[in-house]
């Protein structure tokens, strides 16, 4: 389990780089209890995935950052990694399968990442990414 101290540490690291997204009460979901929705769709990349990507990249040493990062994604994680990498001046490569729609690939490229289309599905793209991870050039996000 992740400790509260680790959560606070991550929050402190990523805070300067993220949007603060609101909690909104949901009438529909609050029938028997109070339910609030965290509107991460208002985040800079449109999802919560940016938070984890930023925390990981901000945790890398300068030496690790200099080698670049790789990730496998079908969309939002890739956008988060691409945005975080661009923000920090880190080269990023996102592996995607041929099943991923072109607009998702373009969105990630627009954020500055190199996109490699490999395999017919996410499992195959993941396998290919591991072959690149064994090279002394990348950290996996």
Mark where each language-model region is.
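Single conserved hydrophobic/aromatic residue that forms the stacking wall/gate
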Residues: 132-141
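PLP-dependent amino-acid enzyme catalytic core
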Residues: 1-133
């Amino acid at each position: 389990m992740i400790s509260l101290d680790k959560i606070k540490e991550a929050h402190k690291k990523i805070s300067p780089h993220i949007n603060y997204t609101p909690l909104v009460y949901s009438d529909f979901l609050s029938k028997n209890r109070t339910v609030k929705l965290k509107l991460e769709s208002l985040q800079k990349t449109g999802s919560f995935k940016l938070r984890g990507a930023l925390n990981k990249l901000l945790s890398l040493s300068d030496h690790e950052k200099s080698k670049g990062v790789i990730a496998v994604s079908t969309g939002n994680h890739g956008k988060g990694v691409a945005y975080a990498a661009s923000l920090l001046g880190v080269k990023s490569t996102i592996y995607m399968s041929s099943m991923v729609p072109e607009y998702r690939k373009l969105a990630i490229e627009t954020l500055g990442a190199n996109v490699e289309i490999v395999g017919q599905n996410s499992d195959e793209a993941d396998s290919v990414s591991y072959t690149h991870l064994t090279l002394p050039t990348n950290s996996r996000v």
